Swiss-Prot record:
GO terms of molecular function: chemokine activity; signaling receptor binding
Protein keywords: Host-virus interaction, Inhibition of host chemokines by virus, Viral immunoevasion
Biological process terms in GO annotation: immune response; symbiont-mediated suppression of host receptor-mediated signal transduction; symbiont-mediated suppression of host signal transduction pathway
Gene encoding the protein: MC148
Protein name from the UniProt record: Chemokine-like protein MC148
Pfam families (alphabetical): IL8
Length: 104
């Protein structure tokens, strides 16, 4: 590849990464949405008191929209260590939250 080709491909990648007109941020994947920041680990310690809704994939990992008991919402992906540890320790509840439990 010549220098100009590399520059053009980088510019194209950057343009593709930008939000497109008419596509609301609400439709983007939860953990990539800047208005819906990931929930800090300390709030995930007792996940039996948190409502999880699977929302598809986030950067190649399963992602969940999370509603805490006080009504706050956020998101978390399966790459989060607190969530993985909890799922491993609650194999009976895991299938209700995530279809990928058999891989743990």
């Amino acid at each position: 590849m010549r220098g100009g080709d590399v520059f053009a491909s980088v510019v194209l990648m950057l343009l593709l990464a930008l939000p497109r007109p008419g596509v609301s941020l609400a439709r983007r994947k939860c953990c990539l949405n800047p208005t819906n920041r990931p929930i800090p680990n300390p709030l995930l310690q007792d996940l039996s008191r948190v409502d999880y809704q699977a929302i598809g994939h986030d950067c190649g990992r399963e992602a969940f929209r999370v509603t805490l008991q006080d009504g706050r919402q956020g998101c978390v992906s399966v790459g989060n260590k607190s969530l993985l540890d909890w799922l491993r320790g609650h194999k009976d509840l895991c299938p209700q939250i995530w279809s990928g439990c058999e891989s743990l």
